[in-house]
């Protein structure tokens, strides 16, 4: 499934894998874009899979003419060995009935590559929130049981809120309670599979609505940064400036090109 760019397979032992879910507003994918661009991560390979719709395009992180002609495909892997980070970016939607197969293959690769844990950046429909969720922060997290032991103290210190359980069938008052992530794509499947396989996984998500979701992506990646400290403020004083996230060059065309002047 994983195909390296070079002749040898990179050593990812004890790396943290960051990846998005293809979810409402594409918030996770935009957040991963910010991480790759800000850290100037190096592409180390891609996934050869029939589970996603094929696509090809220009390098979304091009900074100069020399690398603007590089091609990108639907699933690519980037790494930053100095921070023990590896990132999987997904750029297209799943083919019908193929998402579960992708999750199984992905987790098999994670186990074989020696990655220490997975962090999934996702989103969920804001209109599905209950009253308690409406009155609190829009961010939630989930941890698999085997990850809770090692990070629960850190998470507790951040005062984060865990994703609440809701009725499996909302229309039935006697329905059992379970984790539901409407609009979350493969998030729930990945989480359930990781629980059953005892893989260390965290899910960080935000309740959002469709639209201009760049602010949601920035806030989600800053939520992640509270935990991992991927980047730090320019100064530590009370007037510390905003974190210096680097916007990818491809975001200039996020909503298409401008209106032709001839229209006016």
Curated annotation (Swiss-Prot):
Entry-linked Pfam families: PAC2
One GO CC annotation: nucleus
Membrane-spanning parts: none
Keywords annotated in UniProt: Chaperone, Nucleus, Phosphoprotein
Protein modification: Degraded by the proteasome upon completion of 20S proteasome maturation.
Localization annotation: Nucleus
In-chain residues carrying the UniProt-annotated modification Phosphothreonine: 137
UniProt-recorded Gene Ontology molecular function terms: molecular adaptor activity
Entry-linked InterPro entries: Proteasome_assmbl_chaperone_2, Proteasome_assmbl_chp_2_euk, PSMG2_sf
Predominant subcellular localization, coarse grouping: nucleus
Biological processes, Gene Ontology terms: chaperone-mediated protein complex assembly; mitotic spindle assembly checkpoint signaling; negative regulation of apoptotic process; regulation of cell cycle
Record family assignment: Belongs to the PSMG2 family.
PANTHER family: PROTEASOME ASSEMBLY CHAPERONE 2
Function: Chaperone protein which promotes assembly of the 20S proteasome as part of a heterodimer with PSMG1. The PSMG1-PSMG2 heterodimer binds to the PSMA5 and PSMA7 proteasome subunits, promotes assembly of the proteasome alpha subunits into the heteroheptameric alpha ring and prevents alpha ring dimerization.
Known partners and oligomeric status: Forms a heterodimer with PSMG1. The PSMG1-PSMG2 heterodimer interacts directly with the PSMA5 and PSMA7 proteasome alpha subunits.
Protein name from the UniProt record: Proteasome assembly chaperone 2
Species: Mus musculus
């Amino acid at each position: 499934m994983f195909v390296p760019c070079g002749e040898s397979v990179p050593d990812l032992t004890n790396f943290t894998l960051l990846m998005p879910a293809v979810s409402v507003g594409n918030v996770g994918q935009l957040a991963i874009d910010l991480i790759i661009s800000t850290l100037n991560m190096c592409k180390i390979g891609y996934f050869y899979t029939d589970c996603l719709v094929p696509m090809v395009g220009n390098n979304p992180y091009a900074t100069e003419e020399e690398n603007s002609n590089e091609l990108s495909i639907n699933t690519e892997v980037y790494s930053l060995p100095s921070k023990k980070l590896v990132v999987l970016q997904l750029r297209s939607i799943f083919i019908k009935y193929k998402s579960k197969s992708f999750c199984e293959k992905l987790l098999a690769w994670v186990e074989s590559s020696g990655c220490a844990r997975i962090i999934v950046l996702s989103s969920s429909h804001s209109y599905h929130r209950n009253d308690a969720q409406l009155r609190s922060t829009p961010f939630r997290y989930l941890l698999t049981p085997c990850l809770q032991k090692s990070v629960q103290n850190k998470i507790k210190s951040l005062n984060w809120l865990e994703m609440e359980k809701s009725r499996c069938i909302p229309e039935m008052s006697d329905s059992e309670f379970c984790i539901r992530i409407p609009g979350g794509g493969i998030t729930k499947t990945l989480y359930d599979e990781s629980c059953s396989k005892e893989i260390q996984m965290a899910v960080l998500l935000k309740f959002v609505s469709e639209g201009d979701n760049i602010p949601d992506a920035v806030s989600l990646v800053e939520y992640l940064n509270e935990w991992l400290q991927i980047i730090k403020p320019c100064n530590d004083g009370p007037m510390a400036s905003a974190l210096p996230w680097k916007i990818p060059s491809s975001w200039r065309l996020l909503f298409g090109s401008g209106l032709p002047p001839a229209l006016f």
